[in-house]
Every structure is written in structure tokens, then in C-alpha cells.
Swiss-Prot record:
Protein source organism: Bartonella henselae (strain ATCC 49882 / DSM 28221 / CCUG 30454 / Houston 1)
EC number: 2.7.4.8
Reactions catalysed according to its record: GMP + ATP = GDP + ADP
Family annotation (InterPro entries): GK/Ca_channel_bsu (IPR008145), Guanylate_kin-like_dom (IPR008144), Guanylate_kinase (IPR017665), Guanylate_kinase_CS (IPR020590), P-loop_NTPase (IPR027417)
Protein name: Guanylate kinase
Length: 222
């Protein structure tokens, strides 16, 4: 059982480290959105909600899954350098506002990104010390196709495009820090949680360590 004191100590330590960007990426249908939802249940990660110009699906809520905007508005923000990353995917634009990311990281909170390879590459280039990336693979192409059809929210043309782009996405697997084959959902969640927890205690992120250790060394024992 976690005590009140332990919670307070954890909060103080969190405020003395910079947050990082925890990226989940995968071909469409490999499971990154489902995995993201399960990870967010712990309350340790804050979801980065992207802006997009694509049409809202029946199951989606504006402001919860995405911020849905027009192409004209997206291009205005893009040209004003408001995005820390943006990409054109399946003919639509997706992007993350720079200001929202910096506001969260400065408080020691970590952000979860559900983005494609294009967005991942931009974040890795612009914030190399602040990114941890995980690539999710399907167990087979047959299973990937099955998942896309079970979702039943895209036309046949869109499904064909997603399958074509999936093979391109998978060619970039070496660009990620970690790679997981999502055959068993519970096992995949467990692996990703382990990766996340290990990354939170990396020495270079924990600003509190140096004064804490200096205090330990200087501490007098009666």
C-alpha cells in the first residue's frame, strides 16, 4: 500500500525532473490506440491530443480523441510555426502544438504520443533528449487486415491505403528505441508499462538526484 508520505515524496521528485515524450507508433490496426487508452488509465501519462483535418469517425469525440480543424486553419498554424511536429497521412494533416508540449514537460509530467513515423522522426530530431519511442507491430499481415475490417469505420479505399502505408511504416522499425509485437494485448501493455517506468528513473532526467546524494554523503550519523 502506498502511504501519503510516499505519494508526497514521489510528487516532489517528479517536480524536480523534466518530463519526457513517450511515443507509441504503429501501422494502422496494429493496436497503438487501444494500448494508449489502457496506459492512460494509470494517470501517470498525459495524452497529447493532436490536431487533424480528417473527418471525425462516429466513435470519436472532438477534443478527446483529436482536435478536428479545417485545412485552412491547420495551414495557418503550420505556417506560423505553432506545431512541434506535423505530418500528412492518408491525405490528411496531423500536428501537435509546441506550446502545449512545453507547458506539460516543464511541470515534470510525461506526455503520451500516438503518432506515425513522420511525427516521431520530427520529435526525435527537435527534442532528442526528451523522447522515448516504442514501435508496435502486428503478429501478421493477416491479423492486421482482420483488425482493420473489424474496426468497420473506414471505406474499402481507405483500408487499402492503410495497408499500403503499413508496409512503408514497418520499414522504419530501426528508428525506434523499443519494438513490441502486439500478439497478446495484456502482455503488450505490461511490457510498455515496464519500459515507461524504467525511463522515468533515468539518471539524466532526475534533477533531484545530485543534491539528494550530496545530502546523503554529508549526513552525520550519531
Amino acid at each position: 500500500m502506498v502511504t501519503f508520505f510516499e505519494n508526497e515524496l514521489s510528487a516532489k521528485k517528479r517536480n524536480q525532473r523534466r518530463g519526457f515524450l513517450f511515443i507509441l507508433s504503429s501501422p494502422s490496426g496494429a493496436g497503438k490506440s487501444t494500448l494508449s487508452r489502457l496506459l492512460l488509465k494509470d494517470g501517470k501519462l498525459e495524452l497529447s491530443i493532436s490536431m487533424t483535418t480528417r473527418q471525425k469517425r462516429p466513435s470519436e469525440v472532438d477534443g478527446l480523441h483529436y482536435h478536428f480543424i479545417s485545412k485552412k486553419e491547420f495551414k495557418r498554424k503550420r505556417d506560423g510555426n505553432e506545431f512541434i511536429e506535423w505530418a500528412e497521412v492518408h491525405g490528411n494533416y496531423y500536428g501537435t502544438l509546441r506550446e502545449s508540449v512545453e507547458n506539460v514537460l516543464s511541470t515534470g509530467r510525461d506526455m503520451l504520443f500516438d503518432i506515425d513515423y513522420q511525427g516521431t522522426k520530427q520529435l526525435q530530431k527537435k527534442m532528442p533528449g526528451d523522447t522515448v519511442s516504442v514501435f508496435i507491430l502486428p503478429p501478421s499481415m493477416k491479423e492486421l487486415i482482420s483488425r482493420l475490417y473489424r474496426r468497420a469505420e473506414d471505406s474499402q479505399d481507405i483500408i487499402n491505403l492503410r495497408l499500403k502505408n503499413a508496409r512503408t511504416e514497418m520499414q522504419h522499425w530501426r528508428s525506434y528505441d523499443y519494438v513490441i509485437i502486439n500478439e497478446n494485448l495484456n502482455q503488450s501493455v505490461s511490457l510498455i508499462k515496464s519500459i515507461y517506468l524504467a525511463e522515468t528513473v533515468k539518471r539524466e532526467r532526475c534533477f533531484f538526484l545530485e543534491p539528494f546524494i550530496n545530502g546523503l554523503i554529508a549526513e552525520k550519523i550519531d
